[in-house]
């Protein structure tokens, strides 16, 4: 698992980018968040933990949890 924070999120389109502690920003989609029984207000600046998944376009964040 990696740590970071939401650097950008578009509520209308449902995607954004997470600023990693090390490395480049990583793409995510709303559906990649694990809500664990409660709603999470996804907004710029929230701290998150996530796993990286390799795609044909690079890496994306998955299994994202608010810290």
Swiss-Prot record:
InterPro entries: Cold_shock_CspA, CSP_DNA-bd, NA-bd_OB-fold
Keywords for the protein's UniProt record, in alphabetical order: Antiviral defense
Keyword DNA repair carried by entry: no
UniProt-listed GO biological process terms: defense response to virus
A GO molecular-function descriptor: nucleic acid binding
Domain of life of the native organism: Bacteria
TM region(s), chain numbering: none
Domain CSD residue range list: 1-66
NCBIfam families documented for this protein: retron_eff_Se72
Function per UniProt: Probable cold shock-like component of antiviral defense system retron Se72, composed of a non-coding RNA (ncRNA), a reverse transcriptase (RT) and this protein. Expression of retron Se72 confers protection against bacteriophage lambda. At multiplicity of infection (MOI) of 0.02 cultures slow growth when infected with lambda but do not collapse, at MOI 2 cultures enter growth stasis.
Protein's name according to its UniProt entry: Retron Se72 cold shock-like protein
Species annotation: Salmonella heidelberg (strain 579083-10)
Organism taxonomic ancestry: Bacteria, Pseudomonadati, Pseudomonadota, Gammaproteobacteria, Enterobacterales
């Amino acid at each position: 698992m990696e740590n970071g924070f939401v650097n950008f999120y578009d509520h209308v389109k449902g995607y954004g980018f997470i600023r990693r502690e090390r490395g480049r920003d990583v793409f995510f989609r709303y559906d990649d968040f694990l809500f664990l029984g409660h709603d999470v207000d996804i907004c710029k600046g929230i701290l998150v933990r996530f796993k990286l998944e390799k795609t044909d376009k690079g890496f994306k964040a998955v299994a994202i949890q608010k810290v």
